[in-house]
A protein has these predicted regions:
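Glycine-rich phosphate-binding loops of nucleotide-dependent enzymes
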Residues: 2-273
Length: 273
């Protein structure tokens, strides 16, 4: 099933300009005891593209994202972001560099409002110390106003204005996913890692999320790395796709190339899509 509106896909194909390599993954291997989660994985991501990572359950997709954003430390290989190569970086350091992440399992502050949850994504941008923030005086007050304005724009962009003061735990699952995306966008990332952003959604919710992802990529110029099980979504909105199976890379190319790759069809798709 195709979720991305035809006019959006056509606009993306005609006007979108893919840049140079912004993220380069080379020979990444990751093991947990005797279990090889990733085996010699290499691929790159270019500026302004939507890069999908697909594969069956247990293929190593989330492990790959965890290596990119510093949650896991691979035993072998390296990751280069904007020309800076790192092997052992923690999540905070990676976030400071300009990489944001959403997770398959939501980790929102359920008792806090939509506004405050998204505001928490601005923490890396805040320069005032905690005392000045609490007192809201001088530069700290001006800074908070600036950050709140940025968050309000994200709330408008995600069309959740009516819920801005609502505790996140009271929202339907699909709207909580939008808040999770909004918190990541609040970091103003250069690369956005999305781990199954449409999992558990109905068709209408998927349509909305597809539109938001395309607009983030198109209007903000944010590079997107996406894990998604819905092949209709992947084929519609991705520029390139890398395919993993049992921790190994078995395919890499455009959606059309992956669609017709015999190894991919055999291991994951079952039939041509």
């Amino acid at each position: 099933m195709s979720f991305a509106p035809h006019s959006v896909r056509k606009r993306q194909a005609v006007f979108k300009k893919i840049g140079a390599v912004i993220l380069d993954v080379q020979n990444i291997s990751l093991s947990f005891g005797g279990v090889k989660a990733l085996q010699d994985i290499s691929f790159n991501v270019k500026e302004h593209e939507i890069r999908a990572i697909i594969g069956p359950n247990g293929a190593g997709k989330s492990s790959m994202l965890n290596c990119i954003n510093g949650v896991y430390q691979p035993q072998q290989g390296s990751i280069t972001f904007r020309g800076q190569t790192f092997k052992h970086m923690n999540s905070h350091q990676v976030a400071v560099m300009g990489v944001a992440r959403t997770f398959q399992n939501l980790a929102l502050f359920k008792g806090m409002s939509v506004l405050d949850n998204i505001m928490s994504g601005r923490n890396l941008k805040i320069k005032s110390n905690l005392l000045l923030q609490a007192l809201r005086i001088g530069p700290a007050e001006k800074e908070e106003i600036m950050h709140r304005e940025a968050v309000e724009k994200i709330i408008d962009f995600l069309e959740i204005q009516a819920y801005r003061k609502t505790p996140v735990g009271q929202l339907p699952y699909g709207l909580q996913k939008r808040v999770d995306l909004g918190r990541a966008l609040a970091m103003e990332p250069q690369v956005l890692l999305l781990d199954e952003p449409m999992a558990g959604m109905n068709v209408e919710e998927k349509q909305d999320m597809c539109r938001f992802i395309l607009d983030v990529n198109d209007e903000f110029g944010t590079t997107v790395v996406l894990i998604e099980h819905d092949m209709g979504v992947v084929m519609d909105i991705s520029d390139r796709v890398v395919v993993l199976d049992y921790g190994k890379k078995i395919g890499d190319g455009t959606p059309e190339e992956v669609r017709n790759n015999k190894d991919v069809i055999s291991a994951y798709l079952g039939t041509s899509v």
